[in-house]
Amino acid sequence: MTNLNKKPDWIKVKAPNSAEYYNTKDLIKNLSLNTVCEEAACPNIGECWSKKHATMIILGSVCTRACMFCNVKTGRPDLLDPHEPQRLAEAVQKLNLKHVVITSVDRDDLEDGGASHFAECINEIRKSSTNTTIEILTPDFLRKEGAAEIIANSKPDVFNHNVETVPSLYKTIRPGARYYNSLSLLHNIKKLSPEIFTKSGMMVGLGEEINEVVQVMDDLREAQVDFLTIGQYLQPTKNHAEVAKYVTPEEFQYLGRIAKTKGFLMVSSTPLTRSSYHADEDFQKLKENYQQRHTVA
């Protein structure tokens, strides 16, 4: 097992310092937008922002949940900003994004969990950036009747909802969520709009067993999920769950090979894999893999 007191070399990344990085940072600040890149202390922020890639957080910056893996602020959430969809669309247009990823904090305080706000953001982007493909990474909408229908009707190109970890760790790592609710949400979106690609991700290094990871793969395929991401859990602060193990690149490759045998259209399994990392390139590969699988010989 790798020494847990320091990150192994395969986790280390260069500090961001490019002009493109700072241009992206300034644009996001000027439009009063939030990004998961900053809020979650993502290790890939330098690379992504240098390429003008950013994952936008909507519905404010304060979450109603307190998951033990996440660095986003928790507490009493902000009031909904009715102008946020327009500002988001403006950022997408100014960054000239071919593919945008939109995520959010959990909003258990809202009647629909924020589903209609996601839909408004998608609609605004479609108006001004007609060729931009849209990926949304949503919360679980636990006990929010009708939320899945709102999301499915808004027709994102990719619907992503992360199961995050194995079910045995939910009580300690993701206490406000329910594993089977997450599976049900993913399955419902696919049933409501089969043309939407579905995606889910999980972290490893939290103390899970490999047989549990494989069972999650099977559960996600049963829910007709197309794309699986697996990445290393990194402790944001000392107040969060500790890293139980730094999984080696070879072990990630092994997990990736197993996942591919399960029938996913696409698998990304590396230490630095995150839900929206290389999302634009992965979307193109996802479409190509779908077309290849459905081409009649």
Swiss-Prot record:
<feature type="binding site">
    <location>
        <position position="48"/>
    </location>
    <ligand>
        <name>[4Fe-4S] cluster 1</name>
    </ligand>
</feature>
<feature type="binding site">
    <location>
        <position position="63"/>
    </location>
    <ligand>
        <name>[4Fe-4S] cluster 2</name>
    </ligand>
</feature>
<keyword id="KW-0963">Cytoplasm</keyword>
<dbReference type="GO" id="GO:0051539">
    <property type="term" value="F:4 iron, 4 sulfur cluster binding"/>
</dbReference>
<dbReference type="Pfam" id="PF04055">
    <property type="entry name" value="Radical_SAM"/>
</dbReference>
<comment type="similarity">
    <text>Belongs to the radical SAM superfamily. Lipoyl synthase family.</text>
</comment>
<feature type="binding site">
    <location>
        <position position="37"/>
    </location>
    <ligand>
        <name>[4Fe-4S] cluster 1</name>
    </ligand>
</feature>
<dbReference type="InterPro" id="IPR031691">
    <property type="entry name" value="LIAS_N"/>
</dbReference>
<dbReference type="InterPro" id="IPR006638">
    <property type="entry name" value="Elp3/MiaA/NifB-like_rSAM"/>
</dbReference>
<keyword id="KW-0411">Iron-sulfur</keyword>
<dbReference type="InterPro" id="IPR003698">
    <property type="entry name" value="Lipoyl_synth"/>
</dbReference>
<dbReference type="InterPro" id="IPR007197">
    <property type="entry name" value="rSAM"/>
</dbReference>
<protein>
    <recommendedName>
        <fullName>Lipoyl synthase</fullName>
        <ecNumber>2.8.1.8</ecNumber>
    </recommendedName>
</protein>
<keyword id="KW-0479">Metal-binding</keyword>
<dbReference type="GO" id="GO:0046872">
    <property type="term" value="F:metal ion binding"/>
</dbReference>
<keyword id="KW-0004">4Fe-4S</keyword>
<feature type="binding site">
    <location>
        <position position="42"/>
    </location>
    <ligand>
        <name>[4Fe-4S] cluster 1</name>
    </ligand>
</feature>
<dbReference type="InterPro" id="IPR013785">
    <property type="entry name" value="Aldolase_TIM"/>
</dbReference>
<feature type="binding site">
    <location>
        <position position="276"/>
    </location>
    <ligand>
        <name>[4Fe-4S] cluster 1</name>
    </ligand>
</feature>
<dbReference type="GO" id="GO:0005737">
    <property type="term" value="C:cytoplasm"/>
</dbReference>
<dbReference type="GO" id="GO:0016992">
    <property type="term" value="F:lipoate synthase activity"/>
</dbReference>
<keyword id="KW-0949">S-adenosyl-L-methionine</keyword>
<feature type="domain" description="Radical SAM core">
    <location>
        <begin position="49"/>
        <end position="265"/>
    </location>
</feature>
<feature type="binding site">
    <location>
        <position position="67"/>
    </location>
    <ligand>
        <name>[4Fe-4S] cluster 2</name>
    </ligand>
</feature>
<dbReference type="Pfam" id="PF16881">
    <property type="entry name" value="LIAS_N"/>
</dbReference>
<feature type="binding site">
    <location>
        <position position="70"/>
    </location>
    <ligand>
        <name>[4Fe-4S] cluster 2</name>
    </ligand>
</feature>
<keyword id="KW-0808">Transferase</keyword>
<keyword id="KW-0408">Iron</keyword>
<comment type="pathway">
    <text>Protein modification; protein lipoylation via endogenous pathway; protein N(6)-(lipoyl)lysine from octanoyl-[acyl-carrier-protein]: step 2/2.</text>
</comment>
